[in-house]
Amino acid sequence: MSAIKIGKENFANEVLNSKKPVLLDFFAVWCGPCRMLGPIVSEIAKERNDVNVSKFHVDEQPKRAAWFQVMSIPVLALIKNGKLENRVVG
């Protein structure tokens, strides 16, 4: 399965209400490290069926990115039962 693009319309359903843990990739197209990480995130999405892998474009939803306290990118966040469990910056 490929990574799911998260937008305003599907955030609650795909992230907060997901039955599986969610690996959320906060990125921007202009971010060099994000572009390097992107293929790895896509590979994880293909290989793992126990976690939903999603991509979150920070420029499209800056308020929601701020809600997650994303100050720099890339950020990978693990969401379980609608709550932030862990995150890795950089």
Question: Each PLM stretch: what is its role?
Answer:
Residues I4-K8, F26, L37-K63, V70:
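Thiol-based oxidoreductase modules, predominantly thioredoxin-like and allied folds used
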Residues F11:
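Substrate-binding pocket helix/loop in short-chain dehydrogenase/reductase
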Residues N17-F27:
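Short active-site neighborhood of thiol/selenol oxidoreductases, capturing the structured segment around
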Residues K5, V22, R87:
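Conserved beta-strand positions that form and line the central face of beta-propeller blades
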Residues P21, P39, P74-L76:
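Short, proline-centered helix/strand-breaking motifs
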Residues S72-G90:
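Non-catalytic, surface beta->alpha helical segment in thiol-disulfide oxidoreductase systems
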Residues C31-C34:
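Short cysteine clusters
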